Amino acid sequence: MLGTPQTQESENKPLIGDLGFGSNNLQPPDTISGILSIHPLGEPCHSVTPCSQDTIEDCALSSTPVANDTNSTCTESEIGLTDDDCNLEEKEAAARAKSDIGEADDSPFEVVRTAVSNSDNPAMPSMTFRSGVLGVFFVCLISFVNQFYWERDNPIALNLLIVQLLCYPLGVAMAWGLPRRMWNCFGYRWTMNPGPFTIKEHVLISLMSNASAYMALTVDIFAVLRLYYNPSFSLWTALVLLLSGQLFAYSLAGLSRTLLVLPASMIWPSSLINASLFRTFHEHQPEFDKSINRASISDSKVGLAVESSLWARDGKQGLGVLSFSLDWSVFSNAFLLSPIATPFWAACNLFVGFVLVFWIALPIAYFNNLWGAASLPLYSASVFTTNSTQYDISRVMRNGVFDAQAYEQYSPLRMSLEFSWVYGIGFAALMSILVHIALYNGKEIIARVRETKTKHDDIHGKLIMQYPSVKAWWYLVMLVASAAAGIAVGVGAHVGVPWWGYILSFAIAIVLIIPVGIIQAVSNRQPGLSLVAELLSGIVLQGIPTGYSILKLYGHGSLAQALSYAQDMKLAHYMKIPPRQVLLYQGIGIVISVVIQTCLFFWLVDHIPDMCRPEGYPWVCRSTNLVYSASIIWNLIGPLKVFGEGSPYSPLLWGFLFGLFLPIPVYFLQRRFPRCTWLKHVYIPVVLSGIVGLPPMPPVDFPMWFLFGFIFNFLIHRYWNTWWQKYNFTLSAGLDSGLALSGIFQFLALSQNGIEINWWGNQVDRQCPLSAQPWLTP
């Protein structure tokens, strides 16, 4: 059990950081079972001493969490409530009698038994004043920060890990400082402070916040409509469409919970890491290293994480050779995520793929003028004519749809060599992950699907059954209502997509949710979904550029969000959170985040000159411009013309075959040489996936990102492991948070007042300007 002292044998097992702990969720096979109950600051587990009446105030004031499980003996009368208000001790005794179980009654899977408790305390507070206030606070914070930075040159993203680390001290502070008296409101008795900050409150806050973590991706869809296709596209239309897409995704996740969440065989490995982290906060008593001043560490986090306008950095258009930067947003952003929280084996795979393609193959092909690419910029996400000018879509459109005759008279579409190669590598990555999953996880997936009947109700399923469930028809009503609202508003607002285009988008998500969800729940890997939606939209909605936006929103976006919500539901399942409370908190998080992010984007567009254009730096909207270019490639002109016969880019279709066969020799080599240490960490889908993100990510970010990963997760991990265990992940969270706060401060205090700080190294127009020019003159 996690609440007992660790033996010497258990301390030698792999650490969380070795298993892909962090936002990227990349874990090598057969190592997730090594998850230990290691404190995020690196401390091993210790037993927790129950607090007595004499020490209750010390428990509340202490930075060490009180164990909020069935081992706690603290009663409500001991924290300021009278015995007449309630007798928590009696409630907990009854709860223990109801939910105590034997060691043999546990999950059938060792990996789950290692990370998740097989007991529950139904009397533990979860839906409280504290969890509501902190949940709303972090939803607003994450929604604002992620959307604010998403359109900037180096976007950052606050995620679940940040919330887990930051909300804990706030929860402990509220448990210490809030009044503990009982209140009567409409016959309901409640208190602001039911006692020590509990693990269930912590989980609910994180689930509410995580509902908004990656919603900025879908806002790009409306950014393209607003900026390029329909300047009159209104805020209210965007709000309804985005809200309908998110609620459709959530209801789809809820309807699929019987197959993706409840079965014991659907493990969702990433949820195990989060569950283990929650338990380390609330079930252990870390002994901090007194030789390290935590206050000075905290100060340095914010001091170092200063935004790009103040630190030296490289230009953005080259390939990043010998690049150097002191800007933390280069090292940790929404494209690459924190190098400190990325396992070193994954960083090596990503960087090797980057070097092979961008530093070796791409320059050779470019300077040999492959496909006439030398007359275009080396790195660009824009689309061009054969004369190397920016592609003017108004020349090939009539009444909002594609005009084939005008296209023949104007120019075929051309892409930079780097941009076109990314599509070819994307084709290979899609096939390679399917083959990789079949080779490495195929038998496991088949076994887990068969076990959904025989191992449906493990101990976690039995314990969660004591709480009222969410009725399936609730989700069904939500799904139908959100889909109907999306169709009605989209057609009524003349977005340009026929009603059946919306139906097709919904059908894509409905058909793929179960098979893709099973793959992700078992293997912790999600097949590439974006290309599937792009291919279908280009085939069935060719000539309608706005069709790309709708299929990305409801087809790809809703499916990806539904899988994220399903993963969060599994985390709540493991942590024994009442399902109806999960529905309420996640629903509130979705609504708040949609309103904040959509309104913020429209405000930025109206108040920032030249937004999403090079002249508007740093508000260059890399991801938005990529979506715009993709809408031209896939829907306006169509894949048959761009990648079909007669096009210079037709050889890129060989990427499908290349990706199909590439993982096979690696698989057999790993079986042939099982003792080869480096070979067992080679993962072709990871090698290819790092390349697919360029663009929108600039190549200049990669070298410094890998350097910091090498320093922290190789050198420090190997030679200063005690420090690494204690401070590695909290340092990453502190740097990301400090960056977000400092950037907002600079925008409000400096940029909004017309103040610019210019010195050598931070002027983007003087950083290798030739890198943005073509090698050959057209």
Question: How would you label these PLM feature ranges?
Answer:
Residues 2-778:
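Alpha-helical multipass membrane-protein architecture
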